[in-house]
Amino acid sequence: MNRRNRSNDLNPEPSIENPNNQIAEEFPGNNSVYKSDGYVDLKNNGRLFPIWILKNFKQYKLPEIIRKENEDPCNVQVKLELRKYQEFVGQYLNPQGPYTSILLYHGLGSGKTASAINLMNILYNYDNGTNFIVLIKASLHNDPWMQDLKEWLGRDPSEQNVDNVTKLDRYKNIHFVHYDSPFADSSFMSVIKTLDLSKPTMYIIDEAHNFIRNVYSNINSKLGKRAKVIYEYIMKDKRENKNTRIVLISATPAINTPFELALMFNLLRPGIFPSSELDFNRTFVTESSYPILNPMKKNMFERRILGLVSYYIGATPDLYARQELKYINLPMSAYQYDIYRIFEKLEAEIQERARRRGKQSQLYRTYTRQACNFVFPYVNMNVNGELRPRPGKFRLSEKLADDFSKGKNLDVPDTEKEILNKYTKAIENYLNETERYFQNINKKDAENGRTIINDLDEFKKGFGTKFNSFLQYYQSEGPRSSLLTEMYNCSPKMLAIAFMTYISPGKVMIYSNYVVMEGIDVMKIYFRLIGFNDFTIAREYMGYCEYHGRIDPKDRVRIKNMFNDKNNVYGNKCKVIMLSPSATEGIQLLDIRQEHIMEPYWTEVRIQQVIGRGVRQCSHRDLPMSERIVDIYRYKVIKPENLDPDDTVRQSTDEYVEDQAKSKANLIESFLGAMKEAAVDCELFKEHNMMSQSYYCFKFPESAVTKTNVGPAYREDIKDDVKYDSGLNSKNSIVERIRVVKVNAVYQINTDNNNPVYSSPTKYWYNKKTGMVYDFETHYPVGQVEFIDNLPNKLDKDTYIMRIDVIIPSITGSVNT
């Protein structure tokens, strides 16, 4: 058993009552006081909160997942019903209690919208006048929200219209606002004007990280205001009305900066963190090259968010294919390095000019990022790597050109349509000339008796024995086609991807931040050079398809359905699908065996979203269990060992971007780890959440919870709270293992003619060294065994008599869902 700061991983039975204990929680900005039996007030006796959860919600503790040998978890029949972790949230936030707001930090496949709808049902059943305002991205309206409302929204017995959810009485209380709309703020205020504000209001914000990122952008740039207007209204409502409830939903609560979390928690519990990013970072972030949550302030961060986070891992790891992650570093060819250096110097000049003007170029490292993927070969004086068409020569705006390169849907002003057409023709000419150049080399190779197909077959035959990677093969001695060398000269990455795809035992997913030119466009050329083609005309197992903004939406749906079809499990119709940023959300790919991430991105969350497109819950169920393995290749090119004399930058742009993303990810992960530890349900759900990683759940020391005056979880004033150091991760906290034994024990509940009346004997865990007794199921401290003459007092030889030292409030019953 683990013991923390003199508090344990053991916990008591819910039959220990404290009938006279009344808890009062004052709501910020409201003079009324919420009085309720059986609850803990975080600002009064909040140190009891972690063990109060265990006592009152032990029925929601998740059991260990045990699979039978050779049992396929994806073929286990699962009944369509709310899971324990979903029911817990409804009971924890029940309208008769003082807790009103939460962040549902629940992973993929957890049924987050169903959890939110369950809360709607509970609140509606308690007060059918409750207002529900659901803030979502427009793309989420039909799927999942309307679909899940149809499935999960409760019905009164008198309601007969089973299929049409929009006619349900309780649906009339639900108001949707699309926070990504250009009119989001006015739409939101229009909804507010229609409501009866004397009734309770619940705000539900789905994909809350996107909404908060918009708020952060409004605050930081001082340009927009849509999200900020909504955010400030909700916060004001929360401050002034005790009946206001907020549910934030996110599997990835922060994207770019931990201050996004401060904005979230200040919405849930106004004023809990500094409203200035500078002040927040000074308090909670270390000053170092690789900053993290300050270990000296981690305890305070966790105490201040107690009660605000529910964490559930989502679909458990056994439902996913196994991932084999491989970071691939490929040295630039001499030719690629020469062209890269030209663009590196050009970018430095652009940045310097922008600095002098007091602006920042939107093209930050764009040229070298593209050159890391591919540089055009020297075909002739007009078509070569150095003269690659650039939007500036066509007077095309940087933003439009960047969106165009990423394959986004463009709403082009008439003034720029003709310019864009000229730019597009110049690009097409470059691509056509480049492909002809490569094909001519291929013809000469055929005449010489050694083609790239020979190289591919040799690589396939020797992979796993003579060669463990493409680079090892490329650098080995032996005959090679000229095309192989030239393709490497222009793009080590794309050549490696083509070779690994050739030997893949199944379907392949390729992602690039770029569609035009140095992304999917050129990747298709590389594939055609090794015998692949568009799936509509390709031979079996040699087809590719595309899924990005330049493909018509209807065609995208058809392509996805074809690729995922049961007749294409191994890729006989289409082996390769190529994705762009527009596919980071909303697409699920089945039976993927290889994923190739062509370049790093500024935020690790983007890459994880991409990886998740091909590794979803039971996305490999059509494959035998032994084949449910996905090799994930993450590429970057590095500069050659010998740099130019005037090159003082050792890192390539690929390396720089990855380094920035990792630093940002480590910082955010340090905060997310603290949130997992402080989650209200940490102990309840740990059998699932800790299947793939282990950590300690936040609790206060036993010495703190056995006092008569227990004390608050945190001090409201953060300056005072800094000194209030207690619990997991506090300065003097320790984690140690203790030895316990199973015993029967009783405690006195009354007297009869001066004779003690005891409770029924119950199983507990007993620490002989300290005399502490712990709940048998959830391991929280209950009390201590009484000692007489240094011997434990017993009712009989098998039953100990204990003293209740930890007075934990109890709630009874549950709310109607």
Swiss-Prot record:
Fetch the SMART domains from UniProt: DEXDc
Q: Where does ATP bind?
A: 106-113
Subcellular location, principal:
virion
Q: Name one Pfam family in it.
A: SNF2-rel_dom
Q: Where is this motif: DEAH box?
A: 206-209
Reactions that this protein is recorded to catalyse: ATP + H2O = ADP + phosphate + H(+)
Q: Name one GO molecular function term.
A: ATP hydrolysis activity
Where on the tree of life does the source sit, at the highest rank?
Answer: Viruses
**How is this protein annotated for GO cellular component?**
virion component
Here the segments flagged for biased composition (Polar residues) are 17-29
Compartment(s): Virion
Q: Where is this region: Disordered?
A: 1-29
Keywords from the UniProt entry: ATP-binding, Helicase, Hydrolase, Nucleotide-binding, Virion
EC number, UniProt record: 3.6.4.13
* Gene Ontology biological-process entries: DNA repair; replication fork processing
Tell me which InterPro entries the record gives.
Helicase_ATP-bd (IPR014001), Helicase_C-like (IPR001650), P-loop_NTPase (IPR027417), SNF2_N (IPR000330)
> What residue stretches are annotated with the Helicase C-terminal domain?
495-661
All copies of domain Helicase ATP-binding, residue ranges: 93-271
Sequence similarity:
Belongs to the DEAD box helicase family. DEAH subfamily.
Q: What is this protein called?
A: Putative ATP-dependent RNA helicase R350
